[in-house]
């Protein structure tokens, strides 16, 4: 089992460089194992009103179009230059169309996606509302979300798996196997639920046994859920304690509307993450 096609979403935000660097690092690693193909997919916000609200920019549509083209060329040059320096042949695509639908369409023939965490303080990084969730759910492919702050020095060496027994968690576990096979440390963590049913939730020991049959050695534990913190914050705290460099979890155990209206583990993690997160649905 392997990742043979890696697709990274690129935009014109300042944090885009982090995704490019991480994508190439991962691509080189994957290439050594499976000769993975890397695609840079440049898709930006196409809502004309959103870019025109950006502070310090002229409001003339013609000027905006020229700036948009300049940013596209700059992103392409950055991506291709980094790939050349790394000695990798890559593919560049900049299709037109509605952002979410365009990325979903291209993502469906990739093995793994790389997306960037939304940054509420960076208007240039806005692509579409709930972009990450919609892409992962619509494409049916796993995605590694890169944090907007800090520096990613490693990804997949020390992995924490958030396990709640859901189909989404099971999907994420299976989708992460190519990475888990090369991890140095793997921890399966279950956050105690207020209404847990041990008869219906596979225990961490069973998940560890499943991974063992894939030649992945994993530890397992159950951590208490503090009253003041939800399951998402508890997982992130545990990841910090274990010095994890990748969190693997399912996207939306509740309905999408429930998560968007009331919040949930997914929204908490996507908002507060400081390490890469592999999401799958």
What are these regions (language model features)?
Residues 1-59, 138, 155-223:
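Small/aliphatic-rich secondary-structure junction motif
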Residues 1-2, 45, 80-113, 213-247, ...:
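Structural beta-alpha unit
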Residues 18, 115-134, 156, 249-271:
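Glycine-rich, Arg-bearing micro-motifs that act as flexible, cationic patches
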Residues 40, 91-94, 145, 188, ...:
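A structural preference for short, hydrophobic beta-strand core positions in alpha/beta folds
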Residues 60-74:
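A short acidic, glycine-rich active-site loop
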Residues 73, 77-86, 123-147, 208, ...:
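P-loop/Walker A phosphate-binding loop and immediately adjacent motor/lid segment at beta-alpha junctions
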Residues 89-150:
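Hydrophobic alpha-helical segments and helix pairs
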Residues 271-281:
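Short, flexible loop segments at boundaries between secondary-structure elements
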């Amino acid at each position: 089992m392997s990742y043979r096609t890696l697709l990274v979403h690129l935009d014109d935000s300042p944090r885009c460089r982090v995704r490019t660097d991480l994508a190439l690092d991962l691509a080189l690693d994957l290439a050594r194992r499976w000769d993975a193909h890397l695609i840079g997919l440049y898709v930006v916000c196409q809502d004309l009103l959103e870019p025109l609200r950006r502070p310090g920019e002229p409001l003339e549509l013609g000027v905006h179009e020229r700036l948009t083209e300049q940013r596209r060329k700059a992103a392409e040059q950055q991506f291709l230059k980094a790939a050349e320096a790394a000695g990798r042949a890559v593919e560049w695509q900049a299709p037109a169309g509605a952002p979410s639908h365009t990325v979903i369409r291209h993502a469906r023939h990739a093995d793994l996606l790389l997306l960037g965490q939304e940054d509420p303080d960076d208007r240039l990084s806005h692509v579409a509302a709930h972009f990450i969730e919609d892409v992962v759910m619509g494409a049916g492919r796993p995605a590694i979300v890169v944090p907007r702050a800090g520096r990613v020095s490693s990804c997949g060496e020390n992995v924490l798996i958030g396990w709640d027994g859901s189909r989404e968690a099971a999907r994420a576990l299976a989708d992460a196997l190519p990475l888990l096979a090369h991890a140095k440390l793997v921890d399966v963590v279950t956050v105690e639920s207020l209404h847990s049913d041990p008869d219906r939730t596979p225990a961490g020991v069973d998940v560890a046994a499943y991974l063992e049959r894939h030649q992945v050695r994993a530890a397992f534990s159950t951590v208490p859920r503090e009253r003041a913190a939800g399951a998402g914050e508890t997982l992130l705290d545990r990841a910090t304690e274990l010095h994890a460099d990748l969190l693997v979890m399912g996207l939306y155990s509740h309905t999408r509307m429930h998560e968007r209206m009331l919040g949930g583990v997914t929204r908490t993690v996507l908002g507060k993450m400081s390490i890469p997160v592999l999401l799958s649905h």
